[in-house]
């Protein structure tokens, strides 16, 4: 009988030890788990950052995964040229090529009958001819006056490759593809001995009510704002400037009671498009009080300070900001490395080790 009790207590002690070990492992894993929330207005580049995490930290996209984006890429390309030709009527811009009016009619007819996400050789030729028309190019230059995908020129300039038989999208094609995010998308990866759980939440107004579910236990917020959106209006409300909306949103996030102790990193994104645009469109279109030089550096710093000045607790809370180009893998890799170092430093500070 004594032997039975002894082996039972041994078994119990063993179970207890295993449970203790598991609890310790869970606690260590939790301590190394970083919950990252990607927030920002619609079309600020959040989903592109998520794609970059897959490329940088999860072995990228396989050929099969790239092929899954083919229909999206064709759909983005078609929607872009349709948006431009539709805007030509609104902006009263004429075609230069006599054949273009007929091409436009054919384009619209084919768009209505073709299966979504497909590209026939005939359709590709029509799109190429229209894209070459100087009137279409003039309309494209005024893209901030209507809604057009940022990737329009990327795909339309490369239509020969994209429409070729046997086309397989590459990672850059995937990064430029655009699908509106609805709901919450979670991506997990490991880096610098940390386990990241990154949450991408739809940025358009109708999606924002879902954010509240993500707020608990957030380690760090990455807020994305498109620098190039300073002369653009919202898709969901054409009375509202996109930059003003972004500032309003950042203000509510930055000073929210939920995030009093949360690290906040500001990604001033689409710096490549901003650099191109700022030479043509003065920043005063968005900030009438701005009288400085319309250079990338001066105008970019002014926008950055507009965001940073919204922080009501500057003495307690530092906002870290980076100029980014979400489609540039090396840039995102460099910036995310810096963000991870901030997270590690903040964690050490919380533990009293820094």
Curated annotation (Swiss-Prot):
GTP binds at residues 40-47, 175-181, 200-204, 269-272, 326. SMART domains: G_alpha. Residues 196-205 are annotated as: G3 motif. The keyword Metal-binding applies. Residues 173-181 are annotated as: G2 motif. It comes from the Eukaryota. Guanine nucleotide-binding protein (G protein) alpha subunit playing a prominent role in bitter and sweet taste transduction as well as in umami (monosodium glutamate, monopotassium glutamate, and inosine monophosphate) taste transduction. This is Guanine nucleotide-binding protein G(t) subunit alpha-3. It comes from Bos taurus. The lineage of its organism: Eukaryota, Metazoa, Chordata, Craniata, Vertebrata. The gene is GNAT3.
């Amino acid at each position: 009988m004594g032997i039975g009790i002894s082996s039972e207590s041994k078994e119990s002690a063993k179970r207890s030890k295993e449970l203790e070990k598991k609890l310790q492992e869970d606690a260590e894993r939790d301590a190394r788990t970083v919950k990252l929330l990607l927030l920002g207005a619609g079309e600020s580049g959040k989903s592109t950052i998520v794609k970059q995490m897959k490329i940088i930290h999860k072995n990228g996209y396989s050929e099969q995964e790239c092929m899954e984006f083919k229909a999206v890429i064709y759909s983005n390309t078609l929607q872009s040229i349709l948006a431009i030709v539709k805007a030509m009527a609104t902006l009263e811009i004429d075609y230069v090529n006599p054949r273009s009016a007929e091409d436009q009619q054919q384009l619209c007819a084919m768009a209505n009958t073709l299966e979504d996400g497909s590209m026939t050789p005939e359709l590709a030729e029509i799109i190429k001819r229209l894209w070459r028309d100087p009137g279409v190019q003039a309309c494209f230059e005024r893209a901030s006056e209507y809604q057009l995908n940022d990737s329009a020129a990327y795909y339309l300039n490369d239509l020969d490759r994209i429409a070729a038989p046997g086309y397989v999208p590459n990672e850059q094609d995937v990064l430029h593809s655009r699908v509106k995010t609805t709901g919450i998308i979670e991506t997990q990866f490991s880096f610098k001995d940390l386990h990241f759980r990154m949450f991408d939440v739809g940025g358009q107004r109708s999606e924002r009510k879902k954010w509240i579910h993500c707020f608990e236990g957030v380690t760090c917020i990455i807020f994305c704002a498109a620098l190039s959106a300073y002369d653009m209006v919202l898709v969901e409300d054409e009375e509202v400037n996109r930059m003003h909306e972004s500032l309003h949103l950042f203000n509510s996030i930055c000073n929210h009671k939920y995030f009093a102790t949360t690290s906040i990193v500001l990604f001033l994104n689409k710096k490549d498009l901003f650099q191109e645009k700022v030479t043509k469109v003065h920043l005063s279109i968005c900030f009438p009080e701005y009288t400085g030089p319309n250079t990338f550096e001066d105008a970019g710093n002014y926008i950055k300070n507009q965001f940073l000045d919204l922080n009501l607790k500057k003495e307690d809370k530092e906002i870290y900001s980076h100029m980014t180009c979400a489609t540039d893998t090396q840039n995102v890799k460099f910036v995310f490395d810096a963000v991870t170092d901030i997270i590690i430093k903040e964690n050490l500070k919380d533990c009293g080790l820094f």
